């Protein structure tokens, strides 16, 4: 099966800065991917490359088996929702929705209308007069109702309150079940979307440092909690991603443990606690940043 997206050694430089650095990934059809990483990690630049909005400095990109750059046949199958989207000054919400079918062959006007009601949007208000949350909601509606085979959401929640964000997640998951496609979701609110994501791509300093199914990641690290001496003895010789403590109590984040190692930890009086996806991302990017600093 040909992947929806395939890149090899993809790089985008701005002067001496490599915003995307040697990225090689393959994304399959009909999966929800999380593209995670802190600000400036390269998420938006990578998505811009994959949607033909940026030119690569070097490396190869294939989207639906061919280059996306200036390729109408590919781009009509792609929807990229980003915070910086611009519209003509006189455009109202209704104009955005009316023009959408020109760009997205699978556009569902009935679904779009239902979402407008869900988000309580004023159709006759100009885009430039919308609140940040309303502006984001319009993007969410376009991304969902486009039903594009490949849909990117770049920080779609900006300005949305908790209720509106949950509405987005619920509608995304329900519509994905009925109309499967490949969705790439970039967000900082990782724990909110953790149950949506089937696969995680973690980018840091322009490099992909994690490319794995979400279920596999959930058990890849664990917190070892207990007295300082006992934790130090147990973690001796292991890679410790993070460690902190209060008084004599210490928590150390370590890589996957075998069943025998888990038993040994408990026999030593240590407690093992799960690490959330958000904590995992933080720990891994901290670890990678430390490696970069040490090699500099």
Regions found by a protein language model. Give the residues of each.
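Conserved ABC transporter NBD signature motif
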Residues: 27, 58-73
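Walker A (P-loop) phosphate-binding loop of ABC-type ATPase nucleotide-binding domains
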Residues: 37-42
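Helix-to-loop junction immediately C-terminal to a conserved catalytic motif
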Residues: 51
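ABC-family P-loop ATPase nucleotide-binding domains
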Residues: 82-138
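Catalytic Walker B motif of ABC-type/P-loop ATPase nucleotide-binding domains
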Residues: 151-155, 160
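ABC transporter nucleotide-binding domain
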Residues: 168-257
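C-terminal coupling/interaction segments
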Residues: 242, 246-296
